[in-house]
Amino acid sequence: MKPSILEKLQQLSDRLEEVTHLLGQPEATSDMDNYRKLTREHAELTPVVEVFQNYRLAQSDLADAEEMLSDPEMKDFAAEEIEAAKAKIGELDTELQKLLLPKDADDDKNIFIEIRAGTGGDEAALFAGDLLRMYSRYAERNRWQVEIVSANESELGGYKEVIARIVGLGAYSRLKFESGGHRVQRVPATESQGRIHTSACTVAVMPEADELEDIELNPADLRIDTFRASGAGGQHINKTDSAVRITHLPTGMVVECQDGRSQHANKAQAMKVLAARLNDAQKREAQAKEAAERKSLIGSGDRSERIRTYNYPQGRVTDHRINLTLHKLDFVMDGDLEEITNALIAEHQAELLAAMGD
């Protein structure tokens, strides 16, 4: 391990000792904001310091075993101990480097997930509905809540565009790599000749902005229109102008919300989506720059990139960024995304570790 990393770990150990001492003082709770800050810092430092302590213990075991090598009677035993200690040190070294990776400040946040039907017409819209169900089922498995914010349904079912809000700790950390182009290969329900068609949808995953604090919205930059909410096929579902359309004039971004119970609710939700989109645009610009520097395929924020193919005849899902193929399409479409998300997170961590080593 690099001396600079060891020095950093020692500083964190010293800081944990200091924070523990401060939390133990009688006056610690007199300033609750500071108390909460210290408690959070204690929780973040503890796992790193515990692994560092195990690392130092393994190094001590290695030194003891190497001393035993000079004793002929203990030589074989010492060799086994040295091998075990070196393996342990290697594992802990990797774990420590992962723990020291820069944290994404958005990882614990709720998300907005936008799914738009692309090439393929009605079949693409049906697939958009399938993707929404897949993410909803994944959210259920994690005990997260799903709220439909806005939906533009197609004639045959499915969605031309749908925006959902997923509420749950860590939602962004698990789903942030879902942004991009999703392609489906299957025989559509409307196909009488049994031919396989290829359709596509675009998915965008955005962290929810913190009470509009993450991004400043100047009222002069917004045009707010109201109109009557409508259902599938354009039929009006109420007689009041409760639906809201907000246009961000500097960027041309448009957000519509009509699923809320009132104009006020729709406006509030639309403002949240707009803030998330603007925040996301800034984040993607920074990510694209970083990704170009380290030639990264994961987390580049490129929405035009085709990231995954769902092949129904073969029961296959392939993530093209990491060359991962799973023959468990039914399970994946039912929300079993853990194997894919874990692999993407591991690859992203490997890229960050490689960058640390440069």
Curated annotation (Swiss-Prot):
The keyword Cytoplasm applies. GO terms for cellular component: cytoplasm. This is Peptide chain release factor 1. GO terms for molecular function: translation release factor activity, codon specific. The lineage of its organism: Bacteria, Pseudomonadati, Pseudomonadota, Betaproteobacteria, Neisseriales. The modification N5-methylglutamine is found at Q235. Its main location: cytoplasm. InterPro entries: PCRF, Pep_chain_release_fac_I, Pep_chain_release_fac_I_sf, Prokaryotic/Mito_RF, RF-1. Belongs to the prokaryotic/mitochondrial release factor family. Keywords: Cytoplasm, Methylation, Protein biosynthesis. It comes from Neisseria meningitidis serogroup B (strain ATCC BAA-335 / MC58). Peptide chain release factor 1 directs the termination of translation in response to the peptide chain termination codons UAG and UAA. The gene is prfA. Signal peptide: none annotated. Pfam families: PCRF (PF03462), RF-1 (PF00472). It is found in: Cytoplasm. Methylated by PrmC. Methylation increases the termination efficiency of RF1.
